[in-house]
Amino acid sequence: MGAHEILDDRGRRRREFLRVAVLGVGASLLAPALLRSPARAAAVDALLLSCMDYRLIAETERYMSGRGLRHKYDHVILAGGALGALTEKYPAWNQTFWEHLDVAIQLHQVHKVIVLDHRDCGAYQVILGEDFAKDRAKETTVHAEQLQNLRKRIVAQYPSLEVELLLMSLDGKVEKVS
C-alpha cells in the first residue's frame, strides 16, 4: 500500500469516527427528552376571553400578571371578545369559544371566566356597523350589554362558574362591568 492510499484510509476512518461521534452526542442529548414523560396539566384559576387587538396584547398580559395570574389561566382570543363569542355573523367563533371553555373545564378545572373587552374595538364596528368609540357613554353601554349577555349564557350552561366582566381602555386601565 502506497503513502497516498494510507493517508486516504486514515482520512476515511477519521471521517467515519467523527460521524459516529456526532451521532452519539446527538442521541445522548435527545435521550432525556425522549424518556421524560410530558408534564401533566395542572388546574388553573380561570379562562380569559379577550379581543385579538394587537394594541392590547401586552397590556392584557401585564394586567393578568398584576393580578397574580401569570401562568394560571387559559386564554381564548376572539375579535370583539364577548361580542365575538356571541355574534351570529361569525357562528364558528361561538362554537370556538364554547368548545375551548369545555376543554378548559375538563383539562384545567377552571372555576372562573374572565371576559375582557376593550374600548375602540374595531370588531364591534365591523360586526355592529357603528363606531362606538366616538361616544364613550354609548360605547360603555354597548360593551356592558354584550358582556352581560355572555355572562348570562355562561351561567346558564355552567351554573357553578364565576364570571367576571371587564372593560379595558387603550391605556391599559381596566374597569369592572357589573
Question: Which residues make up each language-model segment?
Answer:
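N-terminal twin-arginine translocation
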Residues: R10-E16, A27-A42
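Short, conserved "active-site rim" segments that organize catalytic pockets and cofactor/ligand binding
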Residues: V20-A21, V25, R40-N94, M168-V174
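Short HxH-centered metal-ligating active-site micro-motif
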Residues: H71-R136
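A short acidic, glycine-rich active-site loop
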Residues: R136-E145
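N-terminal secretory signal peptides
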Residues: M1-R12
